[in-house]
Amino acid sequence: ALLEPAACIAAAAIKAHALPGERVAVVGTGTLGMFAVQFLRAGSPAELLVVGTRDDREALSRRFGATDFRTRDQDLPDDFDVVIETAGSASAARTAAALLRRGGRLVLTGIPGPGADGLDPTDLVVRQLEVHTVFGAPPDAWSHTVRVFGAGLLDPLPLVTHELPLAEFSEAIRLVGSGDPKVGKVLLRP
């Protein structure tokens, strides 16, 4: 059930082209962010930082392979090789870009609301940042996801917080729309 969002992040990981030993980061701690941590960890980074807005996501981030966790209001470094942004806000995109060293690679996967203030083009040019975007998953990303999952390097189950029978669809919708930070993915079983 969670391979589709994982495939979108596989597309981001492919575009990021993170090499073993590079310093990598993920901005965002939702489902996409946790998949990004797992994909980047599989590439043997020297350091894997996760930046989010909620302290309660640190344990899960570390479980998936993060070596450091910070909230975006803490002091953040500016010398990472690769950053994948998954939060879907303009401020997350700006935070992600600020984490990069000159010549670093940024992959944006989140979609901010219409009219959001974007990245500073002068900053992108002067710092020679390489910027990629992802929307959906092409066939190579799906293949990569299935291989990584089959190899045991991708674990979506900790992201599922509730499993309900299909007959409880309305309860599932209520849970998802509740805004409760303890509600992750809700899985309906037929």
PLM regions with names:
Residues A1-D73:
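Mid-domain Rossmann-like dinucleotide-binding core that forms the NAD(H)/NADP(H) cofactor-binding site
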Residues A90-A151, R189-P190:
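Glycine-rich phosphate-binding loop and adjacent beta-alpha segment
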Residues H17-L19, G88, R101-R102, L154, ...:
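Short conserved AdoMet
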Residues D75-V83:
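A short acidic, Gly/Pro-enriched loop at the edge of an enzyme's catalytic core
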